[in-house]
């Protein structure tokens, strides 16, 4: 069974050498995290516990520039960055989808 949450962070970034996105600008990123697991005691995990684990990772980036963490903060690299941190926080297989504005996203699947 799958269980998911959505969180939001506001961050700036610029893509060095890119004509349009080379200037510093910001986005409200939508982060979807969907875990997969077996129900135990009627649920996979309490939503509050899942939200806490995800927020603990996202709080590091909220209202900051992704250029502090990545040389080239494309949405693909941002997705890998956040997904890599979630690997240590979530004992489940999961999918993370990072939306950069409306209609544009990168997705990473992690199997445990």
Please identify what each model-predicted range represents.
Residues 1-112:
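Charge-rich, low-complexity N-terminal segments
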């Amino acid at each position: 069974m799958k269980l998911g949450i959505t969180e939001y962070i506001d961050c700036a970034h610029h893509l060095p050498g890119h004509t349009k996105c080379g200037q510093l600008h910001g986005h409200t990123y939508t982060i979807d995290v969907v875990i997969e697991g077996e129900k135990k005691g009627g649920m996979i995990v309490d939503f509050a516990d899942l939200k806490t684990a995800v927020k603990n990772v996202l709080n590091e980036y909220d209202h900051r520039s992704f250029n502090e963490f990545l040389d080239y903060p494309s949405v693909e690299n941002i997705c890998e960055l956040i997904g890599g941190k979630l690997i240590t926080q979530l004992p489940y297989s999961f999918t993370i989808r990072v939306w950069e504005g409306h209609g544009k996203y990168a997705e990473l699947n992690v199997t445990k």
